[in-house]
Amino acid sequence: VRAPAATAAHAQQLLDQVNQFLEHPVPPALERALRTVPRHLFLPDRIWRGDGQGGYDLCDRTAEPERWLEEAYTDTSLVTQFTDGLPTSSASMPSMVLRTLQLAGLHAPSRPLSAAEMGTATGFNAALLCALLGDQAVTTIELDAALAERGERNLHAAGYTPKLVRGDAAVAWQHNAPYDLILATFSVDRIPPAWRAQSAPGGRIITPWNSAWCCYGTLALTAHHDGSAQGRFHPFASYMPMRRPHPALATPQPATTDHPTLLTATSTLSPWAVAGGDLDAEFHVGLTVPGASFSWDTTGDHAPVRLEVADTTGPSCATVDYDGHHSDRFTVAQSGPRQLWDEITAAYDRWQTLGRPRVDQHGLTVDATGNHTPWVEAAGRRHTVRARPGTSAESQP
């Protein structure tokens, strides 16, 4: 017997909050799934909620059972695991989960579908998929052994029995393949080849997106017969990045090679324009300047405000200083084989030229060999955007 929700009132409270956040009622099929799957059964005794200041507040069910249950049925993300002081697993915000499921078309499937979830975590998302598609149609994959065990225990306690696999979500798993839907619960900066290989023609690949510059957005791809996939980004969700089992397969770290040559110049591009919270601009920079990351230094040791830019794939770096007086020119220092600030400036200029496109005007084509080509739709044309300066945008009808 499937376990009921804590109370009907708790489920209604969560549904009301989700509807309010999404600004529209969720489709009936998704509403039934949310009412059916008891979120509290998928949470550990100790959960952490963001405190709005970069930290986390602990809620322990043993000490505060009523508050813990209230948190379980609040439309918010909850950290469920820390590793070396950093959050490494969470229960996603329910409204984001339902928005993703709606994007995948699961609110009104026209035929039976098979789905692979990449990242079981608590098991809550897998349970929603089971409620929508049936247990036998769902495969869920988890790399972390402890999370896999916990997710399996949670799913069984709630009465759901999808196919559970312990392993790397970036490699091929044949159970139920090819899939009509591949749904990731973590963010990626490239589409693993196995996801395209395991997608049925016309199948959907839905994944949160990240770049070294901007961890934001959800990519919805459609797979094609020739092994390629194409789709558009959507302006919601910021998820933890994919974890890999071997360091050699992880995201490359900056090289240690010293590049003493330091080029200094003056720039009219404000660092706040590309790293000050404009998600449309930051998304474009992140998508088209691969490997570039940033951090702010406001200690005053070098300048009142300094933007530090680094290349996560090599030794290049740059700094942009605000002297506290002039907001129309900034001192730039660059070193390494890439002139990072020049690349970022070119990307920002292109974004301006294209009419400051929103996140949802951006898209991605992944060809059968795995090449990733980002593009922007603006002024009725599709523009293939280039990462390096000095290369003009190519337009396609």
PLM regions: where:
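Class I SAM-dependent transferase core
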Residues: 2-116, 125, 132, 151, ...
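Hydrophobic alpha-helical segments that drive targeting, anchoring, or assembly
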Residues: 25, 30-31, 85-97, 210, ...
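Short, solvent-exposed coil/turn elements at secondary-structure transition points
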Residues: 40, 48, 168-170, 211, ...
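Short amphipathic beta-strand/extended segments with alternating polar/hydrophobic composition
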Residues: 59, 231-237, 315-324
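Conserved nucleotide-cofactor-binding alpha/beta core module
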Residues: 88-206, 211-213
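Class I SAM-binding transferase module
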Residues: 183, 188-304, 383-397
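C-terminal catalytic lobe of FAD-dependent flavoproteins
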Residues: 306, 311
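C-terminal target-recognition/interaction regions appended to catalytic cores
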Residues: 312-397
